[in-house]
Design a protein with these regions (language model features):
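Flexible loop/hinge segments at secondary-structure junctions
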Residues: 24-333
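Bacterial N-terminal signal peptides that target proteins for export
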Residues: 1-8
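Cleavable N-terminal signal peptides
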Residues: 10-11, 22
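Sec/Tat signal peptide C-region and signal peptidase I cleavage site
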Residues: 17-24
Length: 333
């Protein structure tokens, strides 16, 4: 009985120590865009190696879903593949959530097909609009309906869900209005589901961020984009996103930081500062397949966080806005 009692005592002591250790570990919560997820996840992994006392969790609720949590005060950081909308700004303001808008990288939103697709190596914005506009639902169901030169084959569509910032940006850039899209496509907030869908269907077409294409380029084919029939076909790439040649699907991606959390909880500020460290902001962003910010822009956004400047630089169109433009824009809260 004595041995059992001692063993029990040691077990209780060990459990208590574990609980105390867990309680001592500070927590930073991030959620939102699946496109931004690889960047924030890479940052979190490296950060936690050097900061064992801080745990960073990163969810994938989609940009819209992430902002819902953020504006309810449930998260410290919201990953976003498009800027905060007017309705989201209002929700945050009504809840007393002040936010700091920080672009973290550039992305080339990538249209993809199955590798065996020999006819749609390049497409115009008009081609894509014809496929994705609301009027196409139930009507444009065959590749030949897009262009006469395309084969008589069914077309299967894959795309992010309606809570996704990538969905918002694509519909704005291609159709001309956010959320303006046909609804008869396979939708998922998990880009890996889209990868598997297109990779397994010779007639498929889909879209998502460049990083997921780069990670799966051996089983997918990227479509070159033309602004019109006379324009050159431009492939989605780090270089073409950096130079602005890849239009209209180049875009900045963001994190939004809860100002109060950054002010009152050192672990949040420490993680954001790590995120913006020039070495990490270049090497880790490149590592996951996105385009690092220009040096001058990164410095400007470091200063924005240091000064805790709140609000958004987006009050007009979100399509075609450069990072350099964002540095100059007046913030509105």
């Amino acid at each position: 009985m004595k041995i059992i009692t001692l063993a029990s005592a040691f077990a209780l002591l060990a459990a208590g120590a574990a609980l105390n250790g867990a309680a001592a570990q500070a927590l930073v919560k991030a959620d939102g865009s699946s496109t931004v997820f690889p960047v924030t996840e890479a940052m979190a992994e490296e950060f936690q190696k050097a900061n064992k006392d801080i745990k960073v969790t990163v969810g994938i609720a989609g940009t819209g879903g992430g902002f819902k949590k953020f504006c309810r005060g449930e998260t410290d950081i919201s990953n976003a593949s498009r800027p905060i909308t007017a309705s989201e700004q209002k929700a945050c303001k009504e809840a007393g959530i002040e936010y700091i808008e920080l672009p973290v990288a550039l992305d080339a939103l990538t249209v993809i097909v199955h590798p065996s697709n020999t006819w749609a190596g390049e497409m115009t914005v008009a081609d894509l609009k014809k496929i994705w506009e609301p009027e196409a639902q139930g009507k444009i169901t065959n590749w030949k309906q897009v262009r006469d030169s395309y084969p008589d084959r069914p077309i299967t569509l894959y795309g992010p869900g309606v809570d996704s910032g990538t969905y918002d940006y694509f519909t704005a850039a291609i159709v001309g209005k956010e959320h303006s899209s046909r609804g008869d496509f396979t939708a998922s907030e998990d880009d890996n589901v889209l990868v598997q869908g297109v990779a397994g269907d010779q007639n498929a077409l889909g879209f998502f961020g460049l990083a997921y294409y780069e990670e799966n380029h051996n089983k997918l084919k990227a479509v070159k984009i033309k602004l019109n029939d006379a324009a050159p076909a431009v492939e989605p790439s780090v270089e073409n996103a950096r130079t602005g040649k890849y239009q209209p699907l180049s875009r900045p991606i963001f994190i939004y930081v809860n100002k109060k959390a950054a002010d009152t909880r050192p672990e949040v500020a420490k993680f954001v500062e790590f995120y913006q460290n020039p070495k990490n902001a270049v090497e880790l962003v490149k590592e996951v397949g996105y385009v690092p910010l220009p040096e001058a822009a990164l410095k400007a956004f470091q200063e924005r966080f240091k000064k805790r400047e709140i609000g958004t630089g987006f009050t007009g169109s979100k399509v075609g806005v450069s990072v350099e433009d964002l540095v100059k824009e007046k913030l509105v809260y």
